[in-house]
Amino acid sequence: MVVTATRLDRLSEAVERALPEGTELVEARFSRGPLLTLLVDREGGPVDHEFCARIISIVAPALEEEGYSGMIEVSSPGIERPLTRPSHFRRFIGRRVRVRVGEPVDGRRNFTGVIERVADAGFVLRLSEDGEEVELPFGSVTRAHLKEDLDK
């Protein structure tokens, strides 16, 4: 099966329309062939096995309407949750993140640091290694996630 960004976008939109109020689709991705993995979060409760099973039963018909008949996996975004929208960066101001950008910024593509400020077009990251600040536009981010220090 060939997966295009447009198809994944259509499936993501179908999932978002079907999700109950207070539930957010954090990320959708294809993994291991026809397995559609949905990372969801919700207000006011855990993303446990029972909740994930309920979400599968809710979104499966919407995905079938879009022509998707493969397997569906629903999971919590986890401790190192992806940041896929500007609202995620705003929510986690002051937290440590790892960011990859498509085009180099200041000669590099990978950054680890603390989100200092968020604006409409991007955010400012205080780098872990030297405390310098770098401004990164949202449009250049190819991957970002919380970076928890599990040794603490």
From Swiss-Prot:
It holds the Pfam family RimP_N. GO terms for cellular component: cytosol. InterPro entries: Ribosome_maturation_RimP (IPR003728), RimP_C (IPR028998), RimP_C_sf (IPR036847), RimP_N (IPR028989), RimP_N_sf (IPR035956). The keyword Cytoplasm applies. Gene3D superfamilies: Ribosome maturation factor RimP, C-terminal domain, RimP-like superfamily, N-terminal. One of its GO terms (biological process) is translation. It comes from the Bacteria. Required for maturation of 30S ribosomal subunits. Belongs to the RimP family. This is Ribosome maturation factor RimP. It comes from Rubrobacter xylanophilus (strain DSM 9941 / JCM 11954 / NBRC 16129 / PRD-1). The gene is rimP.
